[in-house]
Structures are given as C-alpha cells and as structure tokens.
A protein has these predicted regions:
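Conserved catalytic-core segment of nucleotide-activated headgroup transferases in glycan assembly
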Residues: 1-72
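Short, glycine-/Ser/Thr-/acidic-enriched flexible segments
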Residues: 20, 62, 111, 129, ...
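Short secondary-structure boundary/capping segments
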Residues: 29-31, 71-74, 122, 139-141
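Alpha-helix C-cap/termination motif
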Residues: 47-51, 79, 100
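Short, well-ordered coil/turn elements that cap or connect secondary structure elements
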Residues: 50, 81-83, 117
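Nucleotide-activated donor-binding/catalytic signature segment of Leloir-type glycosyltransferases, i.e.
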Residues: 71-89
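A donor-sugar binding/catalytic signature common to diverse glycosyltransferases
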Residues: 90-136
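Leloir-type glycosyltransferase catalytic cores
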Residues: 135-212
C-alpha cells in the first residue's frame, strides 16, 4: 500500500476482480470468465495507457481459496512487455486505493459504485445499474486510460441515484442481530418512511441523464 499511496499516487488504475462464479459475470457481461476479463483489460492497457501508468489487479478476498490469478498476471506482463507496470494485490484497503488511483475498471462489481462515492472515474465493462451517463465513463475502454485523468462523475447525480437506490431497493435490517419477537429468522428493522420528494427528483435526474 505504501508504494501505491506514494510513488504510484495518481499513476495507477485499479481492476477489482469479482468472484469467479459471480452470476453477474456469467449473465450480465460478454466475458466467458473473470480470467477472460483480465486478459482483455491488460491487452487494452498495454496498447493504449500512458507509459508512466501502472495496472493493479486486485483479487476478490472471497475467491482466493478457489482461484489464483498470479500466474496469469505474470504471463500477461511478459506477453505485453509490462514488467513493473502490472501488479497483483490482495488485501489492500479499498477506500484508500480509491483516493490514490487514476480510475477503476470493473465488470459490474459494486466496488464500482463505491468508487463513484469517492468521486473516482469508473469504467464498467458489463451491465451495471450504475452505468449511467454522467456517472461512469461512457466511451470505450481503450479511451478510458487517457481520459480518466480529466473525467469525473457528477456528484449531484450520484447523490440522487444513491438516495433513489436506498429508498427503493434496500430494506433496513440485519442478518446478525437477534430475531424480532423471539421468533426464527433475521431481524428486520422498521423502514423509515420514503422521502417521495427526494425519490422523484432522483428518478427524474437519473432518467434525464440516461436519455441524453
């Protein structure tokens, strides 16, 4: 982390990987596998990224016992002449990485949504609910490597979209607290009343940007 936060500050792109069996990869992307995604991203980076930038592949913490991409990353570095410009990491703190990276490339991981909350440029390569004009980079991956330095997500649009998702798609509760009334099952806290004004504004703003 020290190297990423100092010598490589604002000089690296982050590629947070999803679990190999993630249905979002299987059904909502054009990639045959996470490994296929890695190969295509590295190929694009090698051909189009500025020579002083580094690509950092971050393994999903829940997939480490099942898949090891270290050998693949090593082979890709040799194939594309990316010695010292292609790294593979595991346990680094994501919010800290967001603050030091140039941008993130994801398939459709929720990590992309988290990166947007930090005002970081994000390029999605699959179908994602947050892949909206004004939030994510809408041009090609090949163009992202150069344009990420000037592209920024719209903070007002993100705030509205986040509020809309929380209001319409989330339930306040916990799987880890005791059950309500002593009965079986997870504890579901009472939801707060919806803020219909915020929801309507959020929906309208999202729709406006999506149609531009």
């Amino acid at each position: 982390m020290e190297v990423l936060a100092s010598r490589l500050h604002k000089k690296f792109f982050l590629v947070p990987l999803q679990i190999s069996g993630d249905s979002q990869v299987m059904h909502h992307s054009r990639y045959a596998s996470v490994a296929d995604f890695v190969c295509r991203v590295v190929e694009s980076f090698a051909a189009h990224a500025p020579a002083d930038t580094t690509l950092v592949i971050k393994h999903h913490p829940l997939d480490r016992g099942y898949h090891d991409y270290g050998a693949l990353v090593f082979d890709l570095a040799k194939k594309h002449g990316l010695k010292n410009r292609l790294l593979c990491i595991h346990d680094q703190h994501l919010p800290t990485l967001f603050d030091h990276m140039l941008g993130a490339v994801v398939i459709n991981s929720t990590v992309g949504f988290s990166a947007l909350s930090h005002g970081a440029p994000v390029k999605t390569c699959g179908l994602a609910i947050y892949d909206i004009q004004g939030l994510t980079f809408q041009e090609s991956l090949d163009e992202f490597w150069e344009d990420a330095q000037i592209f920024r997500p719209n903070p007002e649009l993100f705030a509205r979209f986040r509020a809309y998702v929380i209001d319409h798609k989330q339930i306040a509760g916990s799987f880890y607290k005791g059950p309500i009334g002593g009965g079986p099952g997870a504890s579901i806290a009472a939801s707060t009343p919806r803020n219909h004004a915020t929801s309507s504004l959020g929906a309208a703003l999202v729709a406006t940007h999506a149609n531009e």
